[in-house]
């Protein structure tokens, strides 16, 4: 696909301002959509919205299909009569409004959501009866039947076993013995239904938000990781999809080879796909996954796109990524199958880092736009990430969720020589401001789409960085201050979008 010339904002749902500890899909999200409209933006890019687990990373979700219950808006539940304000308004959701406290959310949020579930069940319909919920409730379960039952069963068993990794469950449940699963379903029916209720509410609220954004001319760009987490419903219930043994343990895992930045490489630990199996099914699971994603997003960014061409396979049990080897992925065979099943694919390929020629060939053959990141550009050479080298069919960023904020990058990461190069390249002035000058450079580039992290428009310091790769704790916490999303800022953003023909004032 090719974008018309436009601009957008990278803003995670979790980072939206508002009460109750984390951004949500209610008024905070709609207010942000309104802000984007006033600011002349066209696209709202978010991070993956799946349930988070260890280290709170949205890229290590326990499901490739489920939504994060933390994003369910409590005020909307109250408006539906499922909660009262006193159920949640006076709870301490964390001591710092500028950061998400995931520990506090885990301790307190599900207690409130269970109240909503029990109130919902008191109104629980019998199929065929005319109630406010009957049609939607049963329709959602029917339409989600290819993933919802296994996910809810997985979460209920996980909770019953102290939330440990499924590889540590009792063997009968771990290997999915039919009698053991049937017995667990019978004994824990209410708990299984609770997890289904959370997904129902997430789906209702998300689709309402998505429709609202569309009505305001805002397209939502979602994000999916190429791999699923080892501790996930997908790995537990669909072990034939992965390189696993009879016990469901991975034979090989994902990562990256050693390079200049990491002498031991990166050991991610995700189970690798059994691409021969996927090919034998016509890529049915991938078709299901992308059909679901494209039903909730307008555009889809796929993380680690290079893994579809060649991927680094590390023997399970290794403590570093050194002893891995390159293996060939499905390449265009997968994307042809997806196109045949789903039609035009509005995909953005995350193609950052060292790339083989075969990866570039795959990107060119697919026609998907790749990414360019300003913070990678200033090496003293004529980098492909310098704005004057951007092709039209790409997405330009000053930085991504894995980068420092522009303010932090310029002030703390660059050498004096690099700062001088940046200043001269963009002709930076004190009057305009360092960060504003760099944003101008990205917006003025020939890239069809320019995406600016909201933190950079707000000129947030390094402390507001969303993620530092390789650091296990302290990530994914930043939240915006609603007071900074001013009419003056929206006007400034709109003016820049109009100036560089990324928006037209009518």
Regions found by a protein language model. Name each.
Residues 1-5, 12, 18, 55-203, ...:
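Alpha-amylase-like alpha-glycosidases and glucanotransferases acting on alpha-linked glucans and related
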Residues 2, 27-52, 295-297, 442:
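Catalytic domains of carbohydrate-active enzymes, especially glycoside hydrolases
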Residues 8, 12-31:
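N-terminal catalytic cores of NTP/NDP-binding nucleotidyl/phosphoryl-transfer enzymes
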Residues 27-34, 204-212, 286-288, 434-438:
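Short alpha-helical segments and helix-capping/turn motifs at coil-helix boundaries
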Residues 37, 206-214, 339, 363-364:
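Surface-exposed amphipathic alpha-helices with a cationic face
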Residues 47, 219-221, 225, 299, ...:
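Outer-envelope exported proteins of Gram-negative bacteria
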Residues 195-228:
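Conserved, well-ordered alpha-helix/loop/beta-strand core segments that scaffold catalytic motifs
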